[in-house]
Amino acid sequence: MFIIAGPVGAGKTTFYEAYLKEPFPTLVPALRHQQQPFLDERRSFAVEDIRVDTQLLDQAKAAGYSTKVLFISTEDANLNVGRVFVRMSRGGQAVPVSSVIDSYRESTKSLSEVPKLADELLVYDNTAHRRGFRIVAHFIGGKLSKTAQTIPDWAAKVFGKELHAVKQHEKLGRGR
């Protein structure tokens, strides 16, 4: 099971369309009653939401699923607002500015818990929209296994302690 999370306008659907649609053709809405049949029938699926639903992670793990979370964000909520306006101008769903900004604030609220709950967490920055998704951190089995050279502020606020520890370890390793 994949959960693709992040604020409105961060690029979740774009990521899904480019990388996950073929192996996970069903993108289930973030509505519990629509996810339950997949869990009951033990079918693979992907969920897109603003925040990572930690209860869904627990439920999926209890049902024997391998759980992978992809979190995508940008450095600034105003960038997301601009992207949503572009999407709306092309016939996409209208989203109020306040909802985009609120989603930016809400999206990281439970994110620091996810490495302990999911089998794998990949954290992406999509600030440089045309340059693609940049991996910021990769957690496997609750442990940070990989980080980018530069960490965006939004990710440092969520995973600061873990990222700092890895950077210190890397510095010590180079000094030998």
Where are the model-predicted features located?
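Anion (oxyanion) recognition and catalysis
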Residues: 39-40, 58-63, 115
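ATP-dependent NMP and nucleoside kinases share a basic, alpha-helical "lid"
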Residues: 50-90
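Switch/connector loops and helix/strand junctions flanking conserved nucleotide-binding motifs
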Residues: 12, 76-83, 130-134
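The conserved Walker
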Residues: 7-8
